[in-house]
Amino acid sequence: MSYPGLTIINKTITLPDGREIQIETGKLAKQADGSAVVKLGNAMILATVVSAKEAKPGVDFMPLSVDYQEKFASNGKIPGGFLKRESRLSDYEILISRLVDRAMRPLFPEDFHADTQVAITLISADADVLPDALACLAAQAAMSVSDIPFNGPVSEVRVISLNGEFIINPKPAQIEKAELELIVAASYDNVIMVEGEMSEVSEELMLNAIKVAHDAIRTQCIVLKELESAAGKTEKRTYSHEVNDWDLKKKINDAVYQQVYEVAKLGNANKNTRAEGFKAVKKAYIESLPADHTEDLTLIGKYYHDVEKDAVRNLILDERKRLDGRSLEQIRPIWSEVGYLPSAHGSAIFTRGETQSLTTVTFGTRLDEQMIDSAMFSGNNKLMLHYNFPGFSTGEVKPNRGPGRREVGHGNLAYRAIKKVMPPEIENPYTIRIVSDILESNGSSSMATVCAGTLALMDAGIKIKAPVSGIAMGLITDTKTGRWAVLSDILGDEDHLGDMDFKVTGTEKGITACQMDIKVDGLSYDILSQALQQANRGRLHILSEMKKTLATPREDLKPHAPRMIMIQIPKELIGAVIGPGGKIIQEIQKTSGATVNIEEKDNAGWVSIFSKDKTALDSALSQIKGIVTLPEVGEVYEGKVKSITAFGAFVEFLPGKDGLLHISEIKWERLDTMEGVLEVGETVKVKLVEVDKKTGKYRLSRKVLIPKPEQQATSNS
């Protein structure tokens, strides 16, 4: 097919398993600064990038926005809801947007501050291709064919470990069986971002997975550079650089560096006291200036921040001492408490230094499950973790407008850390909502959520496989001297001023989740390895502190917690439990007071019974077991007379199962009439003596349970 006036460029990336990723540019969205379509199988992603020609006055940061969205039409679906159209991004789309943002943001020039938007859209879906692993590749392809200043290329891949092998960009069915799943972002030379979940794996396995992913990304980076050359975009646009006064910068450094260093060296554990100390040095410097000085106060603030950063980093590298006086591996003081909220189904407080989480656990039924309806996925989620970060946690005034992208990301990390140790559904039929409210924050609040969430689950009586703890690691490097220091349990300032934020969660056995963002080039795998080993020691220390509060799950639920059990029944008996028009299941709920749900899954019926008291639960369970229990010849049952005829009575000996008690089987003596023998509703003990092989009808006997008259007479004599 010809495309008059268009210059279309195509490139191909071959995955290790032989599948091919196609990159096409020049056909769609040509008025954007850059656009590209990435295709794998039937999955197609359109990415566009647009950047303003000039930065807005006074902007001293990178105003980058990344939005990933899935069109429902991409998978032949119409959106739900009243409007029937795509609206605000879902949490799933926000998480993918964050993956791309975190990979690309560090690679823009430090002084490039023009508004930049990356829009990534799934326009065709494939059930065997997860689009999140292609989103960054598509965004970089669009960036490569634009003139926007960018120190790329960068790309992302998913890597899993399955049966001892690493697989790049696996199919969903493979991911479900994997013991490790990571999304890794990297340039040709450096790993930039890592995020994923694992089934209690070793640090070595995780490190090897990152290396395999990086090798696959290098192949993609080579093709992306070829794409850039083919598009003629190797030269990027010029832009207005930041205004700097290098003489002023040196003057400020000479005047205040030592004072700032001494404030940092005090090792005060209170962040507000430290902040006041740094502010006092800055204030004194400004007050020392002549009244008629012409120096820019904005530049003074910027350069003073640089001095602060250098002083704190040098303190760590020179004296192996940190802002709050700790050594490099030292963990802040920890205290925790469970059962703090008497009416919650489970609760815990976890405090580490100046970071505190109050976390609750709430039980619900299947009716409380979170409904998921997206272009790629439809279903229900029975485990939820919500993370809240109010302004007061950092002493700030901030309007409460619901969770932002940061809250969604932090909550997802904690969710992935904990879900790996949740018991199987047959042991834990509840829908569970975990809510972490951060009451104080000075670094590692997501890791505090993991610790508090674990304690709250154990307080609630959920039999998790093992308790999980989490720690945030940091890094300070000096490329000139080659010195570096890995920090355990970082403060907010150490995160801000450092070169790495590496969060690791796990049990005593191994890692369950991780999230890493690296801000420095040339980070070696040796340093990563040390960070992982140091994190392991920190995690185990935190875990030991948690166990002092609660080492294992409580034996039983709280007295006020709802009760729920799940039983499996044969698939063919689902209809028997439900009854015609739902009559039987409604009757069970009415008479017992419990809520009963039933569904077919894995070629079996799964019945969940939910109640706020044990009596109602036992009643419903007894009735359901009666329905699904297969009658056995020779067994004795206590039944109820349902109707009486001239030739006998029909007795319900199990719920929904009636048998004929013939007039000849009621007594040993001959009966000519049923009048006055039995009454409807009367309870009678019977024995199942036969099941008709042709009709399946049941024949009951009462007299076989009564001694014969001659036996009775002999006994009496």
UniProtKB/Swiss-Prot annotation:
GO CC term, one of those recorded: cytosol
Presence of the UniProt keyword ATP-binding in the record: no
GO BP annotation list: mRNA catabolic process; RNA processing
Domain of life: Bacteria
InterPro entries: ExoRNase_PH_dom1, ExoRNase_PH_dom2, ExoRNase_PH_dom2_sf, KH_dom, KH_dom_type_1, KH_dom_type_1_sf, NA-bd_OB-fold, PNPase
Substrates-to-products reaction catalysed: RNA(n+1) + phosphate = RNA(n) + a ribonucleoside 5'-diphosphate
Domain S1 motif: 634-703
Coiled-coil intervals, chain numbering: none
SMART domains, per the entry: KH (SM00322), S1 (SM00316)
Ranges where the KH domain occurs: 562-624
Cofactor(s) essential for the protein: Mg(2+)
Gene3D superfamilies: GHMP Kinase, N-terminal domain, K Homology domain, type 1, Nucleic acid-binding proteins
UniProt GO MF annotations: 3'-5'-RNA exonuclease activity; magnesium ion binding; polyribonucleotide nucleotidyltransferase activity; RNA binding
Entry keyword set: Cytoplasm, Magnesium, Metal-binding, Nucleotidyltransferase, RNA-binding, Transferase
Chief place of localization: cytoplasm
Keyword Transcription regulation listed: no
Enzyme Commission number, as recorded: 2.7.7.8
Enzyme class: transferase
Annotated positions binding Mg(2+): 495, 501
Subcellular location as annotated: Cytoplasm
Main function: Involved in mRNA degradation. Catalyzes the phosphorolysis of single-stranded polyribonucleotides processively in the 3'- to 5'-direction.
Similarity comment text for this entry: Belongs to the polyribonucleotide nucleotidyltransferase family.
Protein name: Polyribonucleotide nucleotidyltransferase
Organism: Cytophaga hutchinsonii (strain ATCC 33406 / DSM 1761 / CIP 103989 / NBRC 15051 / NCIMB 9469 / D465)
Lineage: Bacteria, Pseudomonadati, Bacteroidota, Cytophagia, Cytophagales
